């Protein structure tokens, strides 16, 4: 019997591996058109001639191959400009043409990779040609219960905001979006949420640079009498050189949270408003953000509201990308009533020959993620917002937005296991890679005295080769906090392969689209073995 069981397990394991590999090979090389793709092309190492041909097509349209009149596929009609613009294409060193694109995104004719971004709420993505996007992810649990990570949810709150803007070719955009939340399983639960994001629009045809930095710290010290949390986040955007006048933009955001105690009847509300604006005669762009949190006590009613706004205006040929998003949540114990309100707004107003993209979104969470129990319970709201814009056809920006959700509830003795969910989809043009972070954080509540917080970080990276996208997801679970402040961490890795909708156009102009989705977990082997045994 033991030999049969062992043999069955080995067979199932081998078959599942073969099937997984066959599926991946089919997705990358399958369908007759894939057989023409060489290994060098799949790995992005094109020949010099291929790169030159693609550059000509990218800048001058398909007619560049035959020497005909350039045709601009998907691009706005070129307009002459006497002064440099961030959207300018220089045919000669002395002549400047400005391609002013409307707010909508256009795909590069060489790949026709349609801009797409999928998330629960409404992020916007525009993607053109090669560029890279990075998101930073930090996970730093404090002694009691504190998690810091991008667009994440812990016991109470989750917020994700990402924005990026790219103007010059070969410009890589980086953004970081951090959210921090803390939770205590005592009747008084305090939560914090903070997010920072910076965006800068390059304004010179010769040089462009986008930089963002953010810091979020959070701490929580629950005790029988009170629990308090304070979160502060700051960001600064780099100033960008311009050919006429100097322009610089800075933004900062500060967030703090209220605390409540376990005393018989107390309620607390917290409201944070963070905004920044800048304007100048030369190009400028600002982004500012957010933050919020609230906590409640043993008898009812906590409310939290947050308002984040960012505005930017400029008077001449400037690109402005302004986006802000935030989320607030409240938590409480017995007889809870929770009200969350979030407002996010962004505005930009350039005047002449310019490209402007603004995105704002707000969502309250009571309908999305809310858990109310007797004992101690928490509810949270989750909101993600992101925007990206790109100016030159040759440059591209891609963003990732992730929606996090959590469930937490506790009775006097029971604790719930971490539940994490992540929604991530990112499409980039052929031979461009995008690295992003998306994650969700689950929380748990335990005994009235013990404090526990669980967080899971899903870091996914995608590489797009022509028509297939492979995501490798690493799930890292960090649990921290107890009466003795002991901490432990567990890391688990799973293989998540998602081949999503993708579209491409070959050099002849024929386009093909296919959609397949498949998920293989290593758990499949165990389940299959169990089925065989049964």
From Swiss-Prot:
It is found in: Endoplasmic reticulum; Cell membrane. Keywords: Cell membrane, Endoplasmic reticulum, Glycoprotein, GPI-anchor, Lipoprotein, Membrane, Signal. One of its GO terms (cellular component) is endoplasmic reticulum. Coiled coil: none annotated. Residues 1-22 form the signal peptide. Glycans are attached at residues 31, 426. It comes from the Eukaryota. It is a lipid-anchor; GPI-anchor. Its main location: endoplasmic reticulum. Residues 70-145, 176-418 are annotated as: Disordered. This is Uncharacterized serine-rich protein C215.13. It comes from Schizosaccharomyces pombe (strain 972 / ATCC 24843).
């Amino acid at each position: 019997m033991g030999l049969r069981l062992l043999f069955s397990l080995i067979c199932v394991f081998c078959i599942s591996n073969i099937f997984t590999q066959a599926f991946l090979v089919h997705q990358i090389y399958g369908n007759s058109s894939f057989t023409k793709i060489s290994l060098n092309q799949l790995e992005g190492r094109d020949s010099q001639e291929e790169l030159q041909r693609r550059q000509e097509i990218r800048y001058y349209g398909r007619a560049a191959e035959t020497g005909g009149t350039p045709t601009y596929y998907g691009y706005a009609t070129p307009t002459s400009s006497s002064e440099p613009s961030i959207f300018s294409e220089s045919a000669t060193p002395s002549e400047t043409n400005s391609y002013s694109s409307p707010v909508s995104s256009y795909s590069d004719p060489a790949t026709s990779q349609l801009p797409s971004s999928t998330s629960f709420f409404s992020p916007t993505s525009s993607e053109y040609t090669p560029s890279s996007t990075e998101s930073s992810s930090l996970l730093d649990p404090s002694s009691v219960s504190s998690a810091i990570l991008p667009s994440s949810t812990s016991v109470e709150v989750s917020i994700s905001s990402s924005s990026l803007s790219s103007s010059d070719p070969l410009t890589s955009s980086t953004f970081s979006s951090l959210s921090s939340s803390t939770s205590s399983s005592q009747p008084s639960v305090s939560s914090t949420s903070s997010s920072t994001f910076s965006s800068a629009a390059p304004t010179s045809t010769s040089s462009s640079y986008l930089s963002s930095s953010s810091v979020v710290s959070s701490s929580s010290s629950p005790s029988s009498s009170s629990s308090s949390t304070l979160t502060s986040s700051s960001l600064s955007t780099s100033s960008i050189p311009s050919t006429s006048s100097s322009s610089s933009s800075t933004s900062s955001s500060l967030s703090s949270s209220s605390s409540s105690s376990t005393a018989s009847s107390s309620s607390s509300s917290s409201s944070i408003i963070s905004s920044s604006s800048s304007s100048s005669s030369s190009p400028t762009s600002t982004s500012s953000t957010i933050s919020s949190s609230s906590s409640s006590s043993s008898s009812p009613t906590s409310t939290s509201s947050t308002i984040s706004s960012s505005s930017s205006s400029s008077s001449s040929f400037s690109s402005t990308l302004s986006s802000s998003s935030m989320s607030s949540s409240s938590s409480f114990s017995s007889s809870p009533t929770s009200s969350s309100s979030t407002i996010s707004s962004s505005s930009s107003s350039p005047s002449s020959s310019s490209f402007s993209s603004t995105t704002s979104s707000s969502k309250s969470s009571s309908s999305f993620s809310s858990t109310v129990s007797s004992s101690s319970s928490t509810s949270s709201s989750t909101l993600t917002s992101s925007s990206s814009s790109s100016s030159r056809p040759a440059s591209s920006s891609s963003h990732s937005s992730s929606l996090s959700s959590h469930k937490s509830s506790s009775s006097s003795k029971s604790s719930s296991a971490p539940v994490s969910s992540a929604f991530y989809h990112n499409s980039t043009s052929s031979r461009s890679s995008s690295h992003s972070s998306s994650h969700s954080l689950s929380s748990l509540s335990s005994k009235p005295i013990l404090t526990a917080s669980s967080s899971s970080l899903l870091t996914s990276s995608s590489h797009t080769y022509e028509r297939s996208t492979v995501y490798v997801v690493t799930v890292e679970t960090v649990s921290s906090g107890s009466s003795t402040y002991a901490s432990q961490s567990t890391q688990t890795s799973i293989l998540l392969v998602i081949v999503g909708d993708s579209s491409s156009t070959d050099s002849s102009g024929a386009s093909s689209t296919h959609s397949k989705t498949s998920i293989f977990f290593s758990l499949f082997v165990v389940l299959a073995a169990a089925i065989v045994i049964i």
